């Protein structure tokens, strides 16, 4: 399943980490465009108060880890998109170009189902998306999350801390699924 990740998902690392960990495990395929990554860079600089070089380095590392995720030549699809906020048309265009089924975003109101259905797309919150991937592949997803948690050094964290932070960051369904699996 190919999922276009919206720029707002890259800002909190506690959210992008599980998404990319499940992708690294082969449970989903992420997609984005240069414009999505540029929006993510600007948001990271603003929210995390880091310089451009640091935000760029973070996103460049993600792009190197997932070289097939970059949707190219999406611009030709943008004029056909009719959203209430025309600044979001590029997200739909990139999703179409990438062959995505899903746009994963916190801004669900910006991606109405009737417009997305014209392109065979739907939008999901990261909570619903992560939970659906977990439900489709529970053992593999749990293994990926264990690897993620054990890899964290700055700061180190336990699975319980990971679950609690995900809950706080508006991922309650996914946090509950992890908690139920851990026991």
What positions do the PLM features span?
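Metal-dependent nucleic-acid phosphoesterase active-site entry motif
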Residues: 1-17
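Alpha-helix/helix-capping structural signal
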Residues: 8-9, 35, 109, 128
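PIN/NYN-family metal-dependent endoribonuclease catalytic core
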Residues: 13-47
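Residues at the C-termini of beta-strands that transition into short coil/loop
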Residues: 34, 75, 125-127
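Extended, non-globular alpha-helical segments
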Residues: 43-65, 136-147, 151-152
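Active-site neighborhoods of divalent-metal-dependent phosphate/nucleic-acid chemistry enzymes
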Residues: 67-102, 136, 156, 167-183
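Acidic, metal-binding active-site segment of PIN/NYN-like and related structure-specific nucleases
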Residues: 88-122
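Acidic, PIN/NYN-like endoribonuclease modules and their adjacent C-terminal/linker elements
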Residues: 109-183
């Amino acid at each position: 399943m190919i999922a276009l990740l919206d720029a707002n998902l890259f800002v909190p690392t506690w959210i992008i980490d599980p998404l990319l960990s499940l992708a690294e495990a082969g449970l989903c395929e992420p997609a984005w465009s240069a414009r999505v990554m540029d929006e993510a860079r600007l948001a990271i600089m603003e929210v995390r108060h880091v310089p451009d070089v640091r935000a760029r380095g973070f996103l460049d590392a993600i792009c190197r880890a997932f070289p097939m995720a970059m949707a190219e030549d999406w611009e030709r699809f943008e004029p056909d998109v009719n959203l209430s906020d025309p600044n979001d048309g590029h997200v739909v265009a990139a999703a179409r170009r990438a062959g995505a089924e899903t746009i994963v975003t916190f801004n669900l109101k910006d991606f109405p189902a009737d417009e997305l259905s014209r392109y065979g797309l739907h939008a999901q919150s990261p909570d619903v998306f992560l939970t659906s991937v977990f439900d489709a592949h529970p053992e593999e997803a749990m293994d990926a999350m264990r690897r993620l948690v054990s890899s964290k050094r700055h700061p180190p964290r336990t699975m319980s801390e990971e679950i609690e932070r995900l809950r706080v960051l508006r991922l309650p369904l996914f946090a509950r699924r992890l908690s139920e699996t851990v026991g």
